[in-house]
Curated annotation (Swiss-Prot):
<protein>
    <recommendedName>
        <fullName>Proteasome subunit beta 2</fullName>
        <ecNumber>3.4.25.1</ecNumber>
    </recommendedName>
</protein>
<dbReference type="GO" id="GO:0005737">
    <property type="term" value="C:cytoplasm"/>
</dbReference>
<comment type="function">
    <text>Component of the proteasome core, a large protease complex with broad specificity involved in protein degradation.</text>
</comment>
<dbReference type="Pfam" id="PF00227">
    <property type="entry name" value="Proteasome"/>
</dbReference>
<feature type="propeptide" description="Removed in mature form; by autocatalysis">
    <location>
        <begin position="1"/>
        <end position="25"/>
    </location>
</feature>
<keyword id="KW-0645">Protease</keyword>
<keyword id="KW-0888">Threonine protease</keyword>
<keyword id="KW-0865">Zymogen</keyword>
<dbReference type="InterPro" id="IPR019983">
    <property type="entry name" value="Pept_T1A_Psome_bsu_arc"/>
</dbReference>
<keyword id="KW-0378">Hydrolase</keyword>
<dbReference type="InterPro" id="IPR023333">
    <property type="entry name" value="Proteasome_suB-type"/>
</dbReference>
<dbReference type="InterPro" id="IPR029055">
    <property type="entry name" value="Ntn_hydrolases_N"/>
</dbReference>
<comment type="subunit">
    <text>The 20S proteasome core is composed of 14 alpha and 14 beta subunits that assemble into four stacked heptameric rings, resulting in a barrel-shaped structure. The two inner rings, each composed of seven catalytic beta subunits, are sandwiched by two outer rings, each composed of seven alpha subunits. The catalytic chamber with the active sites is on the inside of the barrel. Has a gated structure, the ends of the cylinder being occluded by the N-termini of the alpha-subunits. Is capped at one or both ends by the proteasome regulatory ATPase, PAN.</text>
</comment>
<comment type="similarity">
    <text>Belongs to the peptidase T1B family.</text>
</comment>
<keyword id="KW-0647">Proteasome</keyword>
<dbReference type="GO" id="GO:0010498">
    <property type="term" value="P:proteasomal protein catabolic process"/>
</dbReference>
<keyword id="KW-0963">Cytoplasm</keyword>
Length: 219
């Protein structure tokens, strides 16, 4: 996860945004396969050169059909996930129907964009299933892209190499999980801010399933 490093406070609205102040950790990946969305994320949180935790959950269930992976500042990610959960509940109570995954991602994009001069330091993946599997990537300014596969965090350049090589649209769910965990493992081997196994969430027409895969069992 991201950590604050001693340094100046240069940047918009006085918040430190240059590389001397903020460093990002984490590896999270998402992909669509066989009418499902697969999300995976490592378990390590860092504070400077210290491993602050080996048991962090970086995949947040926003409802029973949509989830979000987080990389960046822990506090920023927590407040955003809390806001989104409550907005989804409010929408369901008001409209008697669940909001689409696109609606959730667009709402998050609007929240991030509205704070662009005092931004949330996060990079996020939103994935879920409404009438079909959906996968979106968002940066700290609210830019949003829809993808078949994606990765975020400091280990993402390494993870992308695996995804580019192994992703196919006809992957089964089990094959997609192996691709995702292989991408996480490859990043963990080279990125000091990622490690300690992976959480995996699979979301499809019948709901969602979560599981933890220890590092030694990552493909």
């Amino acid at each position: 996860m991201a950590e604050w490093i001693a340094g100046g406070l240069e940047g918009p609205a006085g918040r430190g945004l240059d590389e001397r102040v903020v460093r990002s950790g984490t590896t999270t990946v998402g992909l669509i396969a066989s009418d499902h969305v697969i999300l995976a994320a490592d378990k390590r949180a860092t504070a400077g050169f210290l491993i602050a935790s080996r048991r962090v959950k970086k995949i947040v269930m926003l409802s029973n059909y949509v989830a979000m992976t987080v990389s960046g500042l822990v506090a920023d990610a927590q407040i955003l996930s809390d806001v989104l959960r409550e907005e989804i509940r409010l929408y369901e109570m008001t409209n008697k129907v669940k909001p689409s995954v696109r609606f959730v991602a667009s709402l998050l994009s609007n929240i991030l964009f509205s704070s662009k001069f005092f931004p949330y330091i996060v990079q996020l993946i939103v994935g879920g299933y409404d009438t079909q599997p959906r996968l979106y990537t968002l940066d700290l300014f609210g830019s949003i892209t829809e993808d078949k596969y994606t990765a975020t965090g400091s280990g993402s350049p390494i993870a992308y190499g695996v995804l580019e090589e192994r992703y196919r649209e006809d992957l089964s769910v089990e094959e997609a999980i192996k691709v995702a965990t292989t991408a996480i493992r490859s990043a963990v081997l080279r990125d000091a801010a990622s490690g300690d196994g992976a959480d995996v969430v699979v979301i499809g027409p019948q709901g969602y399933e979560e599981k933890f895969i220890p590092y030694n069992s990552l493909v």
